[in-house]
Regions:
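Binuclear metal-ion centers of metallo-dependent hydrolases, dominated by the metallo-beta-lactamase
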Residues: 1-4, 71-121
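Active-site-proximal loop/helix segments of hydrolase catalytic cores
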Residues: 1-76
């Protein structure tokens, strides 16, 4: 196991919604069971070892945020992006859209604000 798997994992719950902050976990370090959350801070900048299929099946995030900048590691990996897309999660990358603010409204609706213009696919 990697020292990254000692990352603090924090779930923030508000009414019926949840957000999971995962630090730099790899698939090996994923806790079990996982909560059903609406928003996921993708582990380890979206590395290839982040977000196993099991994790995404248990979490079912509507929104995933990948904090990543220019790097020599190839983060986020194509495999992780494909897993998030297959899980039906809306993905926001800070290298493409700048800072990301996520608000959960009283009715459970999720509002995402990006600080750079985001091109529609």
């Amino acid at each position: 196991a990697s020292v990254n798997d000692l990352s603090m994992v924090v779930e923030v719950a508000y009414r019926e919604s949840g957000v999971l902050f995962t630090g730099d976990l790899s698939a090996e370090g994923e806790p079990s069971p996982l909560p059903d959350v609406d928003v996921l801070k993708v582990p380890h900048h979206g590395s290839a070892q982040a977000c196993s299929d099991r994790m995404l099946a248990e979490l079912t995030p509507q929104v995933s945020v990948i904090p990543v900048g220019e790097n020599n590691y190839g983060h986020p990996s194509e495999q992780t992006l494909e897993r998030l897309e297959s899980a039906g999660s809306e993905v926001y990358r800070t290298d493409e859209c700048g800072a990301v603010t996520v608000r959960i409204l009283k009715d459970g609706a999720i509002r995402v604000k990006t600080y750079l213009p985001v091109e529609e696919p």
